[in-house]
Structure formats: structure tokens, C-alpha cells
């Protein structure tokens, strides 16, 4: 596979050049991406499940306060027999088979998560929806400047913006834009790519992302 060429634009949305993106991350074909949809789906579902707190809880008849004595005698009243006013059929009674605290997380191997991210990034790159933008806010944060830089590239569509942790001004500039989800390069994940129509890297964010992906490869080698 050949490296993928991504457009680089300035703070006015004008093209200033290109940058090579590694084929092993951005270069999978549409057919390969299509064949990996079950993998992508599994990783996204696992990520959403892991985000659940799982603190929901209902009270069973044994947990509800009261109901210690039998409301009336077993026989002779003409009414149905009852053992407690906290039985499920009673108003303010306990809940039957209600939700209890649980852990929703699913085991997802690192290689699966890494592979899913590569395929969704390739899908966006194949559509021309991945770009590198110079926001031009290195001296002071400016949301107005960030909007001017992003609009020509993303057409105001929902965008995941990948930033470096070192450049705080870029984060402050884009965090309040309604159509933008900012994320640091080492946190980029499958879900945040799938839910966005465009993926935009800052220059430093792109370098940081590639550096983060190169470290595991170097360890395996």
C-alpha cells in the first residue's frame, strides 16, 4: 500500500501543501473497511458499554422499609391472603427482577481496538474527510480564528479535532464550537471517528498521533 496524501490548510482554509500519512493507518481500501464492519461495531459497542456507570439499583421486597408483619390474618376475612405490604403487587412494594449494580465493560484486546481505529480512519480518508489544519492560534486562543480555519475544510459538519497536549491555545479555541469534538492525539478512538463526518488534525496533533502509533510498533519489533 502507498502512503496517503492529506491536504494541509492554513488558518483561512487555503491549501498550503500536503503531508504523507502512513498507509498502514490511513490506506485501507473501501472493500477492506467494509469487510471489517463487524470488528468496528464490536469495538464501538464495547466502548459505549464501558462508559456506563452501572450504578442503577432497585429495591426488592426485602430491601423496602416496612412490611414486617402480616397485614391481616390468613383466613376468615374474605380477602386474598397477604404476607407483607411490601410484596411486589402492593403500592410501594418491592420490585421484581429490577436492575441491580453491575459492570457493563467488555474485554476488548488492544489489537482489536487499534485495528478498528485504522479502518475507520481509512474510511474517512477514502472519502477525503481527513485533513491537517494550521489554526494559527499559537500566541493567543481565538474561537473566531478556529472557525475561520475549519469552515472551508469541514463545511460546518460535525468534526473530531485531534490536538497535541502541548498546544493549549488550540484546545481553548475549538472547545466551544458546537460542531466540534476536541480530543488529544493519544485519546483518539474508533467511536469519536465513527460519529464525526470529518477528522481534522492540528500539525502538532498529527505528529503526536503518529508518534503514539509508532511506539507500540517499535516495542513489537
Curated annotation (Swiss-Prot):
SUPFAM superfamilies hit by this protein: Ribosomal protein L4 (SSF52166)
The ranges of region (Disordered) come to 56-83
Q: Which UniProt keywords apply?
A: Ribonucleoprotein, Ribosomal protein, RNA-binding, rRNA-binding
Sorted alphabetically, the Gene Ontology cellular component annotations on this record are: ribonucleoprotein complex; ribosome
| GO MF annotation: an example | structural constituent of ribosome
Q: Which GO terms describe its biological process?
A: translation
Asked whether the keyword Methyltransferase is assigned, the reply is no
What quaternary structure, including any partners, is listed in this protein's UniProt entry? Part of the 50S ribosomal subunit.
Q: What does this protein do?
A: One of the primary rRNA binding proteins, this protein initially binds near the 5'-end of the 23S rRNA. It is important during the early stages of 50S assembly. It makes multiple contacts with different domains of the 23S rRNA in the assembled 50S subunit and ribosome.
Family according to the record: Belongs to the universal ribosomal protein uL4 family.
Q: What is this protein called?
A: Large ribosomal subunit protein uL4
Q: What is the lineage of its organism?
A: Bacteria, Bacillati, Actinomycetota, Actinomycetes, Bifidobacteriales
**Gene that encodes the chain:** rplD
Amino acid at each position: 500500500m502507498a502512503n496517503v496524501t492529506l491536504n494541509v490548510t492554513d488558518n483561512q482554509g487555503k491549501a498550503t501543501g500536503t503531508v504523507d500519512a502512513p498507509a498502514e493507518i490511513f490506506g485501507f481500501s473501501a472493500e477492506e473497511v467494509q469487510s471489517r464492519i463487524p470488528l468496528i461495531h464490536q469495538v464501538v459497542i464495547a466502548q459505549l458499554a464501558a462508559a456506563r456507570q452501572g450504578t442503577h439499583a432497585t429495591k426488592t421486597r426485602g430491601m423496602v422499609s416496612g412490611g414486617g408483619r402480616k397485614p391481616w390474618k390468613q383466613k376468615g376475612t374474605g380477602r386474598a391472603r397477604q404476607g407483607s405490604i411490601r410484596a411486589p403487587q402492593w403500592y410501594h412494594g418491592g420490585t421484581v427482577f429490577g436492575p441491580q449494580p453491575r459492570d457493563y465493560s467488555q474485554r476488548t484486546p488492544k489489537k482489536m481496538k487499534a485495528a478498528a481505529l485504522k479502518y475507520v480512519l481509512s474510511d474517512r480518508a477514502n472519502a477525503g474527510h481527513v485533513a491537517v489544519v494550521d489554526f494559527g492560534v499559537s500566541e493567543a486562543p481565538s474561537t473566531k480564528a478556529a472557525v475561520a480555519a475549519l469552515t472551508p475544510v469541514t463545511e460546518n459538519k460535525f468534526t473530531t479535532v485531534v490536538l497535541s497536549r502541548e498546544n493549549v491555545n488550540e484546545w481553548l479555541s475549538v472547545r466551544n464550537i458546537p460542531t466540534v469534538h476536541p480530543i488529544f492525539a493519544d485519546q483518539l478512538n474508533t467511536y469519536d471517528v465513527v460519529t464525526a463526518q470529518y477528522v481534522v488534525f492540528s500539525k502538532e496533533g498529527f505528529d503526536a498521533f503518529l508518534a503514539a502509533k509508532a511506539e507500540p510498533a517499535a516495542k513489537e519489533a
